[in-house]
Amino acid sequence: RSRALILGVLALTTMLSLCGGEDDIEADHVAFYGISVYQSPGDIGQYTFEFDGDELFYVDLDKKETVWMLPEFGQLTSFDPQGGLQEIATGKYNLEILIKDSNFTPAANEAPQATVFPKSPVLLGQPNTLICFVDNIFPPVINITWLRNSKSVTDGVYETSFLVNRDHSFHKLSYLTFIPSDDDIYDCKVEHWGLEEPVLKHWEPEIPAPMSELTETVVCALGLSVGLVGIVVGTIFIIQGLRSGGTSRHPGPL
């Protein structure tokens, strides 16, 4: 299967160096927006907008709507998704022309890397969020699925669009809101063209092993012993202090 990728990228900066390269550009803030389209069965492509490396929104190709990273952003401004959809369509058209008019070498499929971790320290019974971070994605076509006790989970799942790395690969984050329980185990399932088979990244809460009755007894005994020693030592110091004070106040011979 031959696949090709074309990226359309425009970067806006507050201060630009006209003659320097990317590493020579100095800017207070950088806004990045662009499209990514690639040859593949079905309608695949995306339009994203980032500011200082953080995604603000993307255009959902299936739902044909603007998806804000934080709902509050959508209350401050707006973006017509038709603009992003039009740019995606233009990019696909240009891609087909490039493929027909040139001899291209299909890009190699890279094997993505996944990591799963909780957003906050885990406490049983307290709501939390699991994050599946998938990096080194190329081409940007991937399926990320959450499993709880080996069963698919769809409620409480949210994922970002494909975010561009400096080496032109992509990364994506998938979130799962959950309530930690010592009865549940979770897996992040990753499917990609660069993998011979799906990869499962396992996670389960690390619950400290309960202390045995003997251990609890020993700990309590040690604590009591330390407390008694402290009382005895403190009493000795107090007595010595009183004696020293009495001696210093005793009148000497005339």
Curated annotation (Swiss-Prot):
It comes from Mus musculus. It is a single-pass type I membrane protein. Residues 110-203 are annotated as: Alpha-2. Residues 243-254 are cytoplasmic. Residues 1-24 form the signal peptide. CDD domains: IgC1_MHC_II_alpha_I-A. The chain crosses the membrane at residues 217-242. Residues 25-216 are extracellular. It holds the Pfam family MHC_II_alpha. It is found in: Membrane. One of its GO terms (molecular function) is peptide antigen binding. Keywords: Adaptive immunity, Disulfide bond, Glycoprotein, Immunity, Membrane, MHC II, Signal, Transmembrane, Transmembrane helix. InterPro entries: Ig-like_dom, Ig-like_dom_sf, Ig-like_fold, Ig/MHC_CS, Ig_C1-set, MHC/Immunoglobulin, MHC_I/II-like_Ag-recog, MHC_II_a/b_N. The keyword Disulfide bond applies. GO terms for biological process: adaptive immune response; antigen processing and presentation; antigen processing and presentation of exogenous peptide antigen via MHC class II; antigen processing and presentation of peptide antigen; positive regulation of T cell differentiation. Belongs to the MHC class II family. Residues 25-109 are annotated as: Alpha-1. GO terms for cellular component: external side of plasma membrane; lysosome; MHC class II protein complex; plasma membrane. Glycans are attached at N103, N143. Its main location: membrane. Residues 112-204 form the Ig-like C1-type domain. This is H-2 class II histocompatibility antigen, I-E alpha chain. The keyword Glycoprotein applies. Residues 204-216 are annotated as: Connecting peptide. Disulfide bonds join C132-C188.
